[in-house]
């Protein structure tokens, strides 16, 4: 029996490649973890970039998020009870109207089989103005498309990569989140995120999980 997701939600994730906002953290938890992040930034300003990959190894409080029962229940409904944390990666956008992610597939860099499920966990409200994720429904079934590296320093992606094959962007869905909500997607889905045009930071933690039989 599913823990928290309905049969319709589970079917939607596997057929469309994503799920929209699911509440997993209380307001108190959000404030606590946001405080932990801000404390780290103050104490180790030169190490903030290390939070962009496998931050659960560096910070015990990030590992606590990875073990959160509400979050794990969601993943269990999608990939079963035997779960391995692949990575916890912060994707922070300052309100400078510069940082973005072009259209890409995470599966191009991490071709994990049978599945890598990525959750965008919001530690602050994340609307389109903040630069929320945009996904192309069902595109995880297309296979990995051709990507081109640009090295653009304004890209939130490691190589400034983007999909150089044509696809229909008009089908994009915005994954807007309230603080404490998580939106999930298959690593193979085509997705992007625009610049942050708000006056607040976008604070998103990517929660990347795989089944242990991967």
State where each predicted segment sits.
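Residues that flank catalytic or metal-binding motifs in active/ligand-binding sites
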Residues: 58, 86, 115-117, 129-131, ...
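Active-site region of the double-stranded beta-helix
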Residues: 81, 105-112, 121-132, 138-140, ...
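Double-stranded beta-helix
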Residues: 128-194
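Non-heme Fe(II)/2-oxoglutarate
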Residues: 39-43, 74, 182-184, 188-214
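A short beta-loop-beta micro-motif enriched in histidine and acidic residues
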Residues: 104-116, 170-171, 177-178, 200-201
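Non-heme Fe(II)-dependent double-stranded beta-helix
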Residues: 1-112, 147-148
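Short, conserved beta-strand element in jelly-roll/cupin
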Residues: 111-128, 176-179, 184, 207-211
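Short, solvent-exposed loop/turn segments at secondary-structure junctions
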Residues: 26-27, 91-93, 108, 126-128, ...
């Amino acid at each position: 029996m599913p823990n928290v997701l309905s049969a319709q939600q589970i079917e939607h994730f596997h057929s469309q490649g994503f799920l929209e906002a699911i509440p997993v953290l209380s307001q108190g938890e959000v404030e606590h973890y946001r405080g932990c992040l801000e404390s780290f930034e103050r104490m180790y300003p030169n190490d903030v970039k290390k939070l962009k990959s496998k931050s659960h190894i560096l910070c015990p409080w990030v590992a606590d998020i990875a073990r959160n029962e509400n979050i794990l229940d969601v993943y269990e409904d999608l990939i079963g009870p035997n779960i391995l944390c692949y990575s916890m990666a912060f994707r922070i956008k300052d309100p400078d109207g510069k940082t973005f992610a072009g259209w890409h597939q995470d599966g191009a860099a991490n071709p994990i089989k049978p599945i890598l499920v990525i959750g965008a966990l919001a530690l602050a409200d994340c609307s389109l103005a903040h630069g929320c994720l945009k996904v192309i429904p069902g595109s995880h079934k297309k296979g990995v498309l051709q990507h081109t590296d640009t090295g653009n320093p304004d890209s939130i992606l490691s190589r400034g990569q983007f999909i150089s094959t044509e696809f229909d962007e008009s089908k994009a869905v915005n994954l807007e989140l309230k603080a404490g909500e998580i939106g999930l997607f298959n690593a193979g889905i085509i997705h992007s995120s625009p610049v942050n045009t708000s006056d607040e930071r976008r604070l998103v933690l990517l929660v990347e999980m795989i089944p242990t039989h991967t």
